[in-house]
């Protein structure tokens, strides 16, 4: 697949049946399933041995810093070099005191870090920010040539949220969230930000016959229903005219 589809080349009408059909077909081809790991395990594979910028390292609270599942801890250990960013200054200072390479920077700003990275990882950040396009622009301009940006965000179509809605009647999620980012929205946000959606990934471990059974069932129903998170993969503006590298 050579980069994202630009629906505006098909029609100037965002409700065009032809444009929607083309986007639907493209997204079906862009979906990647990873059934041997969860999203954090997938992230560790992506960053291993790489120069990495990790955006949103605090994960809301210092109480996560000593947990084995703390994302930045695992990403920074797997990467060859890792710079972490967050806007919560006191917690950034605490992490610096613990020996982490972190800075207090707004990743929706025009700030220039003076470094370029093979991987930029923004884990569960995009649904919090006022300006998702600005976040993608910031991340995109800090990519090295051939680098990739990975953005994780909750999947509103997953059974996790459907079951919660059915159980509670009124859907209440993280109170700091301001958006859900579906695949079509990721495609459009990338177009507006000057980065290009390459693929979207669904990661969750399934073993043995359970994996085979689900692969069979997904022939008849949407796989997205089973996965609580999306991982969007973008490439930077400098690489948009270049041939796509295969997704890892």
How would you describe each model-predicted region?
Residues 2-33, 37, 65, 130-247:
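S-adenosyl-L-methionine-dependent methyltransferase catalytic module, highlighting the catalytic core
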Residues 40:
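Aromatic-lined ligand-binding clefts that engage carbohydrates, nucleic acids, or primary amines
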Residues 92, 247-248:
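N-terminal amphipathic/basic-hydrophobic helices that include classical n-h-c signal peptides
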Residues 44-163, 180-190, 230-238:
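Conserved SAM-binding loop
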């Amino acid at each position: 697949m050579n980069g994202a589809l630009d629906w505006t080349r098909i029609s100037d009408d965002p409700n065009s049946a032809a444009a929607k059909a083309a986007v639907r077909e493209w997204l079906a081809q862009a979906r990647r399933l990873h059934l041997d790991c969860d999203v954090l395990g997938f992230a560790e594979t992506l960053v291993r041995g790489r120069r990495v910028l990790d955006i949103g390292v605090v994960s809301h609270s210092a109480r996560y810093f000593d947990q084995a599942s703390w994302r930045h801890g695992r990403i920074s250990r797997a990467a060859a070099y890792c710079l972490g960013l967050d806007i919560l200054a006191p917690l950034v200072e605490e992490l610096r005191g613990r020996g982490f390479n972190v800075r207090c920077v707004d990743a929706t700003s025009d700030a220039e870090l003076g470094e370029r990275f093979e991987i930029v990882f923004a884990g569960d950040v995009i649904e919090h920010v006022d300006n998702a396009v600005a976040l993608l622009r910031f991340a995109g301009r800090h990519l090295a040539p051939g680098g990739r940006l990975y953005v994780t965000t909750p999947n509103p179509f997953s059974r996790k949220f459907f079951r919660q809605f059915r159980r509670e009647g009124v859907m209440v999620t993280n109170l700091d969230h301001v958006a859900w980012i579906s695949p079509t929205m990721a495609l459009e946000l990338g177009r507006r930000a000057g980065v290009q959606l390459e693929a979207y990934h669904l990661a969750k471990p399934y073993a043995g016959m359970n994996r085979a059974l689900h692969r069979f069932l997904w022939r008849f129903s949407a796989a997205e229903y089973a996965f609580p998170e999306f991982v969007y993969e973008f490439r930077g503006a400098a690489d948009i005219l270049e041939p796509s590298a295969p997704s890892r």
